[in-house]
């Protein structure tokens, strides 16, 4: 996060406080519960202890809770099992449509190179159109799910033209290895691992298909009660992001040690990652709204939603 961006984010919080968005802040926070997946910035922030250091003077303990994908993390946010956490673009949309008490706090960039739909190199599947009638592994409600429906729509197809097989990344990896699915839609490091193992045929990249971000989310009530904790946490993430940008080789090594994914794959993933964090802009809201509208149009969510209703603080709207 650049200095300008940090100042801008702090200004948003200050303005929101001045307009009474938060009301009286809680006297203090004993524990901050962070939901994360073992990818990218969360791992680096945890390893370096930047959030712990930022909150130490307040006596706040930081607890990290691991998730395998975004949808269960969003549900944990909704019920207060965790206070803040990271997901891709699709999980908060499904959550908001289901009435989850979550808010968008900040955005993390994605250059779209670390998420793809692919098939094995010896497969007859060479384009998205070739997926018609085929089995495609994907995590339901994940960012890869969004990539899949967007890529199909772009090719004049829909989910009804394929057989989606909803699997966790670990289960999808096994299914792909044993040819129980014909193609796979997934993100790094699973995509990078598949690249190093199979040299797959890339059918679609996120960068060629849609504009997407990763998001730092919070439980709505928690964000309202503890804006100071949110600000300090985002500041700390900015510090970790700057370090990661300047030390991608060390990022790869750290992720390798934490995940046991081979260093070659983690190096590939780290080198194409963009590390930053910034406020939710009008353009980000518009991109996310486009995705939400697509999901409603395709019947993936039960009602239309307005992304702006879930952007925190309300004064950014």
Predicted regions located by residue number:
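N-terminal export leaders
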Residues: 5-10
């Amino acid at each position: 996060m650049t200095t300008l961006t940090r100042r801008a984010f702090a200004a948003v919080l200050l303005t929101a406080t001045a307009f009474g968005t938060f009301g009286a802040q809680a006297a203090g926070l004993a524990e901050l519960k962070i939901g994360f997946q073992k990818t990218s910035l969360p791992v680096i922030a945890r390893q370096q202890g930047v959030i712990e250091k930022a909150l130490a003077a307040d006596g706040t303990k930081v607890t990290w809770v691991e998730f395998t994908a975004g949808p269960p993390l969003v549900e944990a946010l909704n019920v207060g099992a965790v206070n803040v956490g990271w997901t891709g673009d699709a999980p908060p949309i499904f959550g908001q449509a289901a009435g989850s008490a979550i808010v968008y706090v900040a955005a993390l960039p994605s250059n779209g190179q670390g998420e793809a739909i692919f098939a094995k190199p010896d497969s007859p599947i060479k384009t998205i159109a070739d997926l018609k009638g085929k089995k495609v592994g994907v995590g339901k409600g994940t960012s890869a799910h969004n990539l899949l429906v967007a890529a199909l729509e772009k090719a004049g197809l829909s989910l009804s033209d394929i057989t989606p097989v909803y699997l966790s990344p670990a289960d999808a990896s096994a299914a792909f290895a044993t040819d129980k699915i014909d193609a796979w839609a997934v993100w790094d490091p699973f995509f990078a691992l598949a690249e190093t193992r199979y040299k797959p045929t890339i059918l679609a990249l996120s960068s060629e298909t849609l504009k997407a971000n990763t998001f730092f989310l919070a439980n709505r009530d928690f964000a309202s009660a503890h804006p100071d904790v949110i600000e300090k946490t985002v500041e700390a993430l900015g510090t970790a992001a700057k370090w990661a940008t300047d030390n991608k080789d060390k990022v790869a090594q750290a992720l390798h040690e934490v995940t046991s994914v081979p260093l070659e794959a983690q190096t590939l993933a780290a080198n194409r990652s963009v590390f930053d964090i910034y406020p939710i802009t009008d353009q980000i809201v518009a991109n996310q709204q486009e995705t939400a509208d697509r999901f409603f149009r395709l019947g993936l969510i039960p009602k239309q939603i307005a992304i702006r209703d879930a952007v925190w603080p309300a004064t950014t709207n």
